[in-house]
Amino acid sequence: MNPFQYSKPADIHEAVHLSSAVSRFIAGGTNLLDLMKENISRPEHLIDITGLPLNEVEETAEGGLRIGALVSNADLAWHPLIEQRYPLLSQAILAGASPQLRNMASTGGNLLQRTRCYYFYDATVPCNKREPGSGCPARTGLNRIHAILGASEQCVATHPSDMCVALAALEARVHVQGRGGARVIEFADFHRLPGDAPQRDNQLADDELITAIELPADHLARHSHYLKIRDRASYAFALVSVAAALELEGDRIVDARLALGGVAHKPWRDRAVEASLIGRAVSRETFSNAADAVLQDAEPLEHNGFKIKLARRAIIRALSDAAVAGDRP
């Protein structure tokens, strides 16, 4: 770990004015400290934001929720309003990491965690995400955990977050503050596909700080389900995950949300497939057709072709489980 300057600002204005291209904000540090220990991230300045007033969950006038960026993953998962109104989010958070990590990890930090690609974490090998232009050995190497959707010649890494898959399905919005003022980013636009710049995971500028996540009022809570498929029962990242939510009138689908994790550089959502579900009857055939449509452009690598079949089955199961989910207030 390299030497660094440490600051603890008293307010958001001071925090964003301390930031620069060589600084990093730190809260729980559950990913950043690992990256620093492995010499993957080498910030010259750490800005401790744990003293900022960003740790509340508040109701909005529109019937949604505003979640402060410093609310811990554990507190968010068990918050009564989240359990009641957004059970999909609670399920996703509790499927990730371990109790100890969830106690420390912040909501804002969860959005910023970096890929768990083996090659990204090995500073002795090339990696376009770590060193742009150096190459992507995962394309021809050990690529069992890598992307089957939205990848590029430059990068086949996947996004590791469970929480973000649910936030994508819930159409969250990300509130950020920079020197130039505040702005709101639609969750669908927050994370990037790798393209020719895989070193950029998201749309944040160097001086911008996530201050809150906003959830719109949700009418799909009753019929929702988060399914995570992984190599072991706990403390493992998803090979494939699915956040599914339905609004039903009888056995007819009125609205649908479907997001996948473990398959792309960002949570993967196909709005055209969601739209195709509307008006359809709840059935295995309906869900099978949706799964096929989501995966029609999947491009497997040498070792991860199994993910296509796995994702197909996971989509069908998650939608089926969402359709029969028990009554929720």
Q: At which residue positions do the language-model features occur?
A:
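C-terminal structural segment of proteins
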Residues: M1-P329
